[in-house]
Structure formats: C-alpha cells, structure tokens
Amino acid sequence: MINQFSRTQLLLGADNMERLSKAKVAVFGIGGVGGYVVEALVRSGVGLFVLVDDDKVCLTNINRQIIATRKTVGQYKVDVMKERILDINPDADVEVRKCFYLPENAHEFDFSEYSYVVDAVDTVTAKIEIIMRAKECGVPVISSMGAGNKLDPAAFQIADIYKTTMCPLAKVMRRELKKRGVKKLKVVYSNEKPTRPLDDMSISCRTNCVCPPGAKHKCTERRDIPGSVAFVPSVAGLILAGEIIKDLTTSPET
C-alpha cells in the first residue's frame, strides 16, 4: 500500500523500514542542527523520538531553525517539534523533555531504552555527559561539533573526534574525552576556518533583548554570540541524520 514512506522503501526495503519504525532516537538539542536531524529522521520513517531541550523559540532563531517562524516564537522548541513530527507521521511516538541535560539530572534518563543518541547541544559539560552515558550503556551516539561562525556547508564531514581539525569546539572535546578514556566518537564537524563576526551582537542584546519571556538561555547571558546562516546548521543536521539512518539499517558501532 502506498504511504508517506513508499519512496524511501524503494531504497531501503521493507525490512529496514520496519526496523526504523521501531527505532527510538533521543535527540538532545532541538536547535539549528538538532531540528533538521529530527526532520530528516521522521521523514525517513523513524517512529519513536525523545526530544530534549528546555529552550523556547526566539525571534533570532528564524534565520536557521526549522521550527522557528513568527507563529512559533515564544513556544517551547520540543512542543513545536513534536507537533511537526505528528503532522508528518501521526503514528509516531514522541516524548518531550523540557530540561537542559546535565550531570545533575542525568539519573532521570534511561539511555538503555534508546536505539540511538544524538548530541546536538552547545555546552561542553552537557555534551560530555551525554556521550559518556551513551558509551556506558552501549548505545550508538553521534555528536555535532560547531556550526556557528561558518559559511561553507560543503566543509562538513563525518569523522572520528580525534581526526577533527580547525573546529574550536572539537578541540575542547578531544581534550576532555581523552581525559575520560574515550577511544573513539563519531562526529560531524566542519574543517572550515571560523569566520569572525562583523559585529558584537551581545552588546545590542543587553539593551534590546528579544528573547521570549521565560527563555532559559537568554542572549544577555552569553559572552559571545556566533553568527549563523540557514544553509550551514541544516546541512550538518542532514548529514547526521543520514549517518543515523545508515547505522540503524545496518549494525552501528558504539
């Protein structure tokens, strides 16, 4: 019977589509990268999602985040993403967690339930905790490195964390993961040299903040605000999703 995934099934086959429909993917960070990861996964037939993010859609997200429109500003990102998932696949199972994942609340998550874990957050502490928990549970995990201050979408590639270059976030992650004995980690990163922003947006944000009421991570609290464009984090997210689908339809390494 023809359905919304029929064209995908022509490439992956019925058995893999069944496997994807039963896969439970946890995505930490529903922003510029994470939103596109989820978008591609649900359109590829993944049937179960755990969306983790405590932030609300901000006006400044509209330039790059698939969930951000004038209508969704002020709404929780996980709620907007859930609605979008169910519009695409009403049979999907979606759990939303309105929290910022850190060691302090790690006990609230059972990683052993997940088929795959996606780290699409910006904070190093959170990234490390997500990765370590996934590794401990033997769950496949993939991590997004920096997408801010970049202009070349073709510079993204999949690599082991210890083979990354140029990315400042990847440099920090290499050091911290090596300290913790992590031997390997699949990541998506850009080898493009970061572009220096033409202006310091954090200055204007202090006097003209447009963050929605109740936002947890206001721009006024950030030391530096990176520049961004629509065609960079989206590509990173789609590359991540492609790798996840490949792994879920074969046998991914942990």
Can you name each region flagged by the protein language model?
Residues 120-121, 144:
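Short, well-ordered coil/turn residues at beta-beta hairpins
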Residues 46, 51-89:
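Glycine-rich phosphate-binding loop and adjoining beta1-alpha1-beta2 segment
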Residues 1-26:
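N-terminal charged helix/coil linker that caps or initiates catalytic domains
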Residues 112-113, 126, 136, 141, ...:
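Glycine-rich phosphate/adenylate-binding loop
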Residues 33-34:
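Hydrophobic/small residue at the entry helix of a nucleotide-binding pocket
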